[in-house]
Amino acid sequence: MADRTPKRSADGLIHDAKPSKVTKNDRPPVIDFKRILAAKIAEKRGGPPVSAVSLIAASTVSTPAPVTYGSVGLPTRQLSDSDDDDEEDNATAKTHSVPIPVFKPPDQLTAPHTVKRKPTQPPTPTRPVHQAQATQRRPVVSYDTTGRRATTQDEITDAFGELDNELRRLAALTPVPGGWPESTRGERNQMVNPVGVKELPIVVQSITDRAIQIENRLEAQFHGATEMVKTVVPTVSVRGGVFTRHVITDTKRQPFLIEACEFIPSMIQEAPIPFRAVASKPFAAGTKLLTPKAGAPAVDLRAAPVLGKGYFGTVYKVGNLACKVQHGRVMPGVSNAISDVVEESLLGSRLQHPNIITFVKGFLYHGAVNTEAVCVSLWELGLMDLLSFTQQSFWQPGKDACDPLVKRYLARRFEKHTLLGLEHLHERGLMHRDIKSQNIFIFTNRGRLVAKLGDLGCCSKGAFCDAGGTRAYFPPETLAINVQCCASDMWAWGVTMWEVHTGRTPFWGGTDISMQKVFRYTGGFDNRAYNQLAVARHAMAAADSAVKPVPDLEGLMERGKVSLSPSFTDIMKSVLRLNPNDRATASDLLKSPRYTDESLTEGCECTDRKSLEKNAPEMIRLLEHNHLPPQKVIMTTDPHERDQLAEKERWGQVPMEVTGDFRPAPLYMPWLARADMGDDHTAKKLITLTPRDLVSVYPVVATKEYGVKEIRVYRPPEFSPTYDIVYLELKPTIDFEAIQSLMEGIQAIQKSIPYVVPVFHYTLGAHGTKRYMIYVTPAKRSITELNFDGETDDGTLLGAVILKQLISLAVAFRDNGINFITNMYNTHILYHDPRGVDIGPLKLDMVIYMLLHQTNNLNVYKLSSTDRTLRDPGDPVLKTCLAAYTYVKLLMSAPRALERLVPKTTISACKRFDDFFMIPTVKKISIPPDTKIKVPKLFSFIKIEPPQDISGGTVYASGTLS
């Protein structure tokens, strides 16, 4: 007879054994689904393939309950993870007849060995049916993921807890009616369900899908967390505030139709209720994009030498300029790449600094979609970038190397120059986001080498933003949780300067190796907690980081075999810190004794942009994009205009950028959030406008010209008395799209004309046939409330001061390309600031004026005279001066006083506006200075009561103030 001794195979299964009746407890094996997920993620990322059996067996946690085998004679014991225990059990095992099949992965499965039974043998199994009972399972930790968490680490813990809960629910072994058809030991001597094994790919796919959903939601939570302190990109900007355009159709509220414009509450600006935005045409008025003249001289780039190539485009040499050609590619995480390159041009045009490269001209070729777009920008051209400079023979060790003292002096110059450029950006709330040696350019001026920051394509605004730039220069917070701030620029600057001194970055290597080095020398994850999965899940948090008081740069230098001066080492220790809040700023470093030598800044002078513009080509010809219409990106019109980004003290000077749909929006200015937002307002509060809050009502006579039926001015107690809410009931025939164009024109002139009433927010609404407009402005009073008969403190007649202001208003309009019309002198639209001196400054409400008088053409740049009361066919300047003179005399109870001070005959002799201002009695009159207006915090929305005012509907309005 054949030997029936049980044989043990390498996989731990017993062969040549009869199928036995297995009495098994109802406790199913507990599976560690995190290990399943980690293995599948590793396989997806190119790791070794894992089979279904090994996957489930390797992730199964032994259940301490005993398993009783029936008449087969197998030993009764607890399942163990130890192979030694299995061998001991096999030593005492009895003989068996029929082999138990060895289960393989699904792709290698063969038909299982079936047991032949006698026909008279009943097929009903005698063993109990397996039923998974939750009460007999190992206690499962259930995480409460519904509560609010205080830290990012709590959110991560909750996400992993939710993942564990979902995986346990989805991936439990499926019970089979009538019991398992076969039950056997699998790898590592654990119970394996063959049906579950066959269904494992489906289960794992379900696990993977669910994990991806949770991961996406978690990433969205992280994105939302960064957005909490990030300024939302609005659609249109104004003097002193921001327009956010909302439209309500009936009572339905729809989200903004603007990419990457999600409104999230934050400490910087509150969240408006999102409404459906009226679509506007690209390149509308105020976009700073103008079509160049036909037949302008052009340059063909096919003959231009190539300076470099990158993912976004190519840089050519055109004369003494660098021509950057960028294509509008939509990348992951970038909603509108072409808007970014246009923004770079507009940013460069407004950043005038000796250590930032000068922008010269910009051109845009735009088609029907964003991918059909090319942005061409001309910049001043330097010698080379800093990386190429440090690769020259005189910088590298060897016989041709320059003197070490000269080398260290040049490095100090470059350090200070780049710090000055970063200070200029950070003071304006801007992050460079891509500081590296390739983006620092070397110039010569008066025999001196000058370093300048370039490549502003990644430049961003706000307190925090998503990661951008080059990974080798990323700080730990960017590597771990994918955010950047101004302190991230300082880290990248430190890495760059380390590279200049040593020839290599301090934390070289791959992503994970680089992170390990960062944490090793600056403090961070405990080694037991650090793993690839944690990094992939952005699991870094301050609570889990053992931050070192001072980075261990000595150990880093010893390991890298480099030697640095003590002063430079101290600088590096102040910027290469794990906690961004502990890093020194550019302003802090510039106070260091290392940079006090004034000779370090010799040759640092602002480039004369006008001289570069004279030699720049009028147009760049792109033959491969002939089907795209060219447009020119226009800079500031006034050549003597100061850097608007530096105008901190004037509330009206708001720097501009271009959003995704090419409408300008203000750059984030941190001083507005700190100082200008009044503390007397409560954010996220409902404002109800009741009849008790009504200050004044102006019924408008119904004529064909007027588009407004009624004007109401509210001053609710929740608002400071320095602000008004204006409600305009519009005619049903009014065109919302025309009003949108009007507001885009108004925002452009509010930025540059101090005589326009600033509008902090406006909303257009419709309910049935009712149409309305609500906007928030500073409190104002009609000019008729002024006392024109008195005198100022210096004895000047008040009427003469008003007259000079009116003429100055006309001059300001003319300088901005607007034909001032005489019927703007109207009591309904001229106001003065009640918080200032008694006589002004005067303000013109362009919104009411345009809707009252210019409904046929709501383009403020196309105003034409419609006042036929003045029949003087003379010069428009004379008409304007005489109209203002007549208006002031009508408001004065003693008009002869004005005649004595400023005779009408003298005004009639004026042929230019300058002639009026040269009148001796007018020349000495001083106009009151414009006052700084604090922008209030945003209320969540504004509600009009009673609702029957708009035929039973409810009006909601909200906006962004900055």
From Swiss-Prot:
What is this enzyme's catalytic activity, as reactions?
Answer: L-seryl-[protein] + ATP = O-phospho-L-seryl-[protein] + ADP + H(+); L-threonyl-[protein] + ATP = O-phospho-L-threonyl-[protein] + ADP + H(+)
Transcription regulation as UniProt keyword: no
Please list the residues that bind ATP.
307-315, 324
Active site residues of this protein? 434 (proton acceptor)
Q: Please name the InterPro entries in this protein's record.
A: Kinase-like_dom_sf (IPR011009), Prot_kinase_dom (IPR000719), Ser/Thr_kinase_AS (IPR008271), Ser_Thr_kinase (IPR053235)
Q: Name one GO molecular function term.
A: protein serine kinase activity
Q: What is its EC number?
A: 2.7.11.1
Q: Which Gene3D superfamilies match?
A: Transferase(Phosphotransferase) domain 1 (1.10.510.10)
The record's annotation in Pfam families points to: Pkinase
The protein's name is: Protein kinase ORF73
To which protein family does this belong? Answer: Belongs to the protein kinase superfamily. Ser/Thr protein kinase family.
